[in-house]
């Protein structure tokens, strides 16, 4: 499905020796794809995405009716929650920050530790986890069946009004696949408009690809390699390491590389929300992180000048396309 059709339906470097665009890295690898991917057993349709949107915003998906998917993945907060750490159902803070769901159609593993391998699989986890939405799936399905307004929505999406776990997760996944970040100044520059990025931002891109080596992990048009790395934060959270044999040292304390799309206004940063500015994040990488056996081989010390740091931050701001024009739906009764 083309980006434009989905959005219509939903309303939806002097300091571095770089001074000309021709000196910058090739742009082709940063071009956005024309289509949103979906699995063969759950092709993306407008009707499924519309149902998924309604479910995403419905707090009745939680046991006590107080929490929807949008509670933590708030469209007004770049599909995160703006908190250092989100609150569990019992009022205790989670150990990990709420990641954005933007551009999740392209993910092959989801959640900070990669425990889910598809959006369909991921959709079940927060609903049924005791300290999140805390609902048993059979009870949830019965609750939805008691809401008369859901039957026609399921019928339009799937051909009949049967409400099942598979259909629930397919609809939620379909809606999330439509959440694609808007065109940012960087994208306009990639397409050839030199005026879309300032000279300072272009120099920052050169720092990003060169001296700072950010692109080693923050690659492709989504600015992530979809892999897991220990970047030397002091947290003792095992991350991906809890899901692989302990002898796989490199995965201990490793977390999924987050996208940099729409990042500047989506802080705080890191999986544990421990950093509050892009300057703080960059300085962490300059210092090389906490040295331990699992630390990524890419975590090598380097030093930027204050000007280079400013250029780099200005470049990262060009990856911000702004808020999606998505209004909460009217919930069925």
UniProtKB/Swiss-Prot annotation:
GO cellular component terms listed in the entry, alphabetical order: periplasmic space
Q: What class of enzyme is it?
A: oxidoreductase
The record's annotation in PROSITE patterns points to: CYTC
Q: Which SUPFAM superfamilies match?
A: Cytochrome c (SSF46626)
Which positions, given as ranges, span the membrane?
none
Cleaved signal peptide residues: 1-21
UniProt cross-references to Pfam families, sorted A to Z: CCP_MauG
InterPro entries associated with the record: Cyt_c-like_dom, Cyt_c-like_dom_sf, Cytochrome_c_Peroxidase/MauG, Di-haem_cyt_c_peroxidsae, MauG/Cytc_peroxidase, Methylamine_utilis_MauG
Could you confirm whether the keyword Oxidoreductase appears in this record? yes
Q: What is this protein called?
A: Methylamine utilization protein MauG
User: Source gene?
Assistant: mauG
């Amino acid at each position: 499905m083309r980006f434009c059709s989905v959005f219509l339906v939903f309303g939806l470097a002097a300091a571095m020796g770089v001074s000309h665009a021709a000196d910058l890295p090739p742009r082709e690898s940063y071009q956005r794809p024309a289509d949103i991917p979906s699995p063969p057993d759950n092709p993306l349709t407008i009707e499924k995405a519309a149902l998924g949107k309604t479910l995403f915003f419905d707090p009745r998906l939680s046991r006590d009716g107080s929490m929807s998917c949008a509670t933590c993945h708030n469209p007004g907060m770049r599909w995160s929650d703006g908190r250092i750490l989100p609150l569990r159902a019992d009022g205790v803070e989670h150990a990990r920050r709420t990641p954005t769901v933007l551009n999740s159609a392209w993910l092959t593993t989801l959640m900070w530790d990669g425990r889910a391998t598809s959006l369909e699989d991921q959709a079940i986890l927060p609903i049924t986890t005791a300290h999140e939405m805390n609902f048993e799936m059979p009870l949830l399905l019965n609750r939805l069946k008691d809401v008369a307004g859901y039957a026609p929505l399921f019928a339009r999406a799937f051909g009949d009004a049967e409400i099942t776990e598979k259909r629930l997760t397919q609809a939620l996944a379909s809606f999330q696949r439509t959440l694609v970040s808007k065109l940012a100044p960087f994208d306009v520059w990639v397409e050839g408009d030199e005026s879309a990025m300032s000279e300072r931002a272009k120099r920052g891109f050169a720092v990003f690809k060169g001296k700072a080596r950010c692109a080693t992990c923050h690659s492709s048009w989504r600015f992530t390699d979809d892999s897991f790395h220990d970047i030397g934060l002091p947290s003792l959270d095992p991350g991906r390491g809890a899901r692989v044999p302990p002898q796989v040292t490199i995965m201990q304390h490793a977390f999924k590389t987050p996208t940099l799309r729409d990042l500047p206004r989506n802080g705080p940063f890191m999986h544990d929300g421990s950093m509050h500015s892009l300057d703080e994040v960059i300085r962490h990488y300059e210092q090389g992180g906490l040295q331990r056996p699992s630390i990524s081989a890419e975590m090598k010390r380097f030093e930027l000048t204050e000007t280079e740091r400013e250029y780099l931050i200005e470049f990262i701001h060009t990856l911000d396309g702004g808020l999606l024009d998505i209004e909460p739906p009217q919930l069925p009764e």
